[in-house]
Amino acid sequence: MNKIPPILEIGGVLISSEILTEFFCCDYEKCKGICCVEGDAGAPVTLEEIADMEEALDTVWSQLSASAQSVIDKQGVAYADKDGEMVTSIVRGKECVFARSLSPSASPRDEGSQDPCWLCMLEKAYREGKTKFCKPISCALYPIREKNFGNGLIGLNYHRWEVCRDAKEKGKALNLPIYKFLKEPLIRRFGKEWYQELCEVAEQLLSEDV
């Protein structure tokens, strides 16, 4: 049995081997989209994504809470966090401005919904064919976190978060490793050829590790 190295290099991208060996599959019925709420800052975004969110704003505006609308009016769809990185704006130090907790009978403009299920209004509009932008790639790639080391060097790590414990259990039950669960966003970020190379390397290493 050959031990899988902790860090792999695929097409100029450094990858934690945990992305190949750990299992994950979002279990929305259990987590209720709480990742859009928990945390001390918004989701990392690029300048291009900020422009995309601003372009989609008119489409989703009526679906946002009054509190979210107020935050956006004051500081926009994004702000610089304590590390100077641009992230999505948040409400009351909690939920993303584009997240809503809705009940089947409540108006999307009503505050105080008791329904614990959180939805991304950007993704909702995208899936309804109303916008071309789905959501920031950092959201789509979770639990993978991307880090830019400079000089074109990028690293991908597995971010462990207690709120995703059900996703770990579901992924294990389905025998679904992180890199397969995140096939679409990984292709969106790095391309089909890069993802194919990742799969080939993963299959070879995992077969040797048996």
Language-model features, listed with the residues they occupy:
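A cross-taxon signal for low-complexity, glycine/charged-rich
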Residues: 108-114
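Low-complexity, intrinsically disordered short segments enriched for Gly/Pro and polybasic residues
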Residues: 102-108
